[in-house]
Amino acid sequence: EWTAEVVEEAAPAVTPETVCLTVYLIGVGLVAGVMLWQVVRIRRLRRGAAITRTERFTLVRTPQRIASFSFFRSIYVWDQIPAGELQAIVAHEASHVAHRHSAERVAMECMKAALWWNPFVWLAARRLTEAEEFEADSDVLAEGYDIEHYMKTIFRQLFGYSPEIANGLRDSLTKKRFKMMTTQTKSRHSLLRLAGTLPALI
């Protein structure tokens, strides 16, 4: 008489490699998820907005209280901004559009998702943002805008929703930007500055 022998297979052991990979993928998912959610929120700002298309960019004037920003070829502003301030704000954001800063920002956000554990990536992202803002400020002042009026306009634009993935006005950069403008320091092209940060990320 034959008897069947039941052999139980041991459950695979949890290895350090598996744990590290799981944690890494969770981090990638969280950072990428935040980026995608920001894109969704940006798209929603078009609802009920007055949209004006030009050869250089699309101006989206939304009833929602936001801090002005640009995302690729679209410039988003609050529709209650005074006309005297709107021109300088649009000039600033149009500079971001012309220099394709959004493409740089998206590339950096993807790098942050892939290398979220590396603090130098987050530092490089901050430096890139600074370089882009300095470059846009330099372009606006080169067009002949009054520096004092422009600085006041920037200060009044600090409040409201402004996604990290987009190019916008942020409080943390205000003092540095004001100092840069008053010393008339010229910024180099932001792509070159970004390339200079890459060796620190490897």
Q: For each predicted feature, which ranges?
A:
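Membrane-embedded and juxtamembrane structural elements of multi-pass membrane proteins
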Residues: 1-202
